[in-house]
C-alpha cells in the first residue's frame, strides 16, 4: 500500500503540528505530532501518540550500549546536546491531544520505526515524516544565515537516505556472514564502520575482533584486507551519509 498525501488532515495546537492520516477503506488511522525547532531546523516527533509502547521501548533502548552509542554519535553529528534530542510535553487537560515523548526525527526514521511490526504503518509513518519535512522547510532570517534549503534539496536528502537504507538491508557481515539487519538481537543490527576501508561488519563482530586483537597485543587490522584502522563508527547504515 502506497502513502497517499491526500489522506492527511493537518491541524496545530500552540507550537505542535498534528498530522492525521485517515484511510477508512483500509481501516488505517495514524496520528503524528511534530514540533519544529526553528533555531536549528530540527524536527521532533511524538512517539507516544503513535503507540504508547514505543516511548517505553525507547527509554529502555537508550539505556543499552547500542542506544547510548547511537545517541552520542547523533549528538556529535548534529551539534545538539544529548539532553536536547528528546522533549516531553506533560499530560494535562490543556495538552491532552499533544502530550508525550518527542524525539529527534533521525531517531524515529532510523531506530524507532523498526520496532513497528506492521509494515503498512511503517511505510505510512515514513511517508508522513518525509512529506512534512519536504513541505515545511524554514530558514531563519538572520544576518549570519545566507543559506536556504529548498523543498527539492530536502527531497534529494531524503532520497539519499532511502537509497542507502535499501542497500544496507542486503549487506552481510564479513565475519559472521549474516545479513546485519536480520540478526536476532536488536543491538547487533548495526554496522561497525572502519576508517581505513569499506569492508562490511556488524558492530558486534568487529568489536569482538577489535577487543581480541587488543588483548593479544596484535595490531588493529581489518579482518579482510588487513589494513590498519584507528576508529570503529557505529552506524545504522553500511556507510556514512553526509
Curated annotation (Swiss-Prot):
Class of the enzyme per the UniProt entry, highest EC level: transferase
Domain KilA-N: from-to ranges: 21-131
Catalytic activity: S-ubiquitinyl-[E2 ubiquitin-conjugating enzyme]-L-cysteine + [acceptor protein]-L-lysine = [E2 ubiquitin-conjugating enzyme]-L-cysteine + N(6)-ubiquitinyl-[acceptor protein]-L-lysine
Compartments in which it is found: Host cytoplasm
A GO term from the CC aspect: host cell cytoplasm
Main localization category: host cell
GO molecular function, one term: ubiquitin protein ligase activity
Top-level division of the source organism's lineage: Viruses
InterPro entries: E3_ubiquitin-prot_ligase_p28 (IPR016398), KilA/APSES_HTH (IPR018004), KilA_N (IPR017880), MKRN-like (IPR045072), Znf_RING (IPR001841), Znf_RING/FYVE/PHD (IPR013083), Znf_RING_CS (IPR017907)
Zinc fingers classed as RING-type: ranges: 173-226
Enzyme Commission number(s) from the entry: 2.3.2.27
Keywords, comma-separated and alphabetical: Host cytoplasm, Host-virus interaction, Metal-binding, Modulation of host cell apoptosis by virus, Modulation of host ubiquitin pathway by viral E3 ligase, Modulation of host ubiquitin pathway by virus, Transferase, Ubl conjugation pathway, Zinc, Zinc-finger
Any Pfam family matching the protein: KilA-N
GO biological process, one term: symbiont-mediated perturbation of host apoptosis
Family according to the record: Belongs to the orthopoxvirus OPG021 family.
Swiss-Prot/TrEMBL domain comment: The RING-type zinc finger domain is required for E3 ligase activity.
Protein purpose: RING-finger E3 ubiquitin ligase which catalyzes the formation of both 'Lys-48'- and 'Lys-63'-linked polyubiquitin chains. Plays an important role in virulence by acting as an anti-apoptotic factor.
Protein name: Host range factor p28
Recorded name of the encoding gene: OPG021
Amino acid at each position: 500500500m502506497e502513502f497517499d498525501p491526500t489522506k492527511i488532515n493537518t491541524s496545530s495546537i500552540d507550537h505542535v503540528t498534528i498530522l492525521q492520516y485517515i484511510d477508512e477503506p483500509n481501516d488505517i488511522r495514524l496520528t503524528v505530532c511534530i514540533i519544529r525547532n526553528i533555531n536549528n531546523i530540527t524536527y521532533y516527533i511524538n512517539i507516544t501518540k503513535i503507540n504508547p509502547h514505543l516511548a517505553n521501548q525507547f527509554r529502555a533502548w537508550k539505556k543499552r550500549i547500542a542506544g547510548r552509542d547511537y545517541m552520542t554519535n547523533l549528538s556529535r553529528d548534529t551539534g545538539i546536546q544529548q539532553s536536547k534530542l528528546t522533549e516531553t510535553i506533560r499530560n494535562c487537560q490543556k495538552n491532552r491531544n499533544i502530550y508525550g515523548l518527542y524525539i529527534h526525527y533521525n531517531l524515529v526514521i532510523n531506530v524507532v520505526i523498526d520496532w513497528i511490526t506492521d509494515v503498512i504503518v511503517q511505510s505510512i509513518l515514513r511517508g508522513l515524516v518525509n512529506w512534512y519535512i519536504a513541505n515545511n522547510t524554514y530558514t531563519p532570517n538572520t544576518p549570519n544565515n545566507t543559506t536556504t534549503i529548498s523543498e527539492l534539496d530536502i527531497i534529494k536528502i531524503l532520497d539519499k537516505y532511502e537509497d542507502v537504507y535499501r542497500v544496507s538491508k542486503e549487506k552481510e557481515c564479513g565475519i559472521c556472514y549474516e545479513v546485519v539487519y536480520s540478526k536476532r538481537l536488536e543491538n547487533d543490527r548495526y554496522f561497525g564502520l572502519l576508517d581505513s576501508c569499506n569492508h562490511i561488519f556488524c558492530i558486534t563482530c568487529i568489536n569482538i575482533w577489535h577487543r581480541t586483537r587488543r588483548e593479544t597485543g596484535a595490531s588493529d587490522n581489518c579482518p579482510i584486507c588487513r589494513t590498519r584502522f584507528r576508529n570503529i563508527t557505529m552506524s545504522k547504515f553500511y556507510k556514512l551519509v553526509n
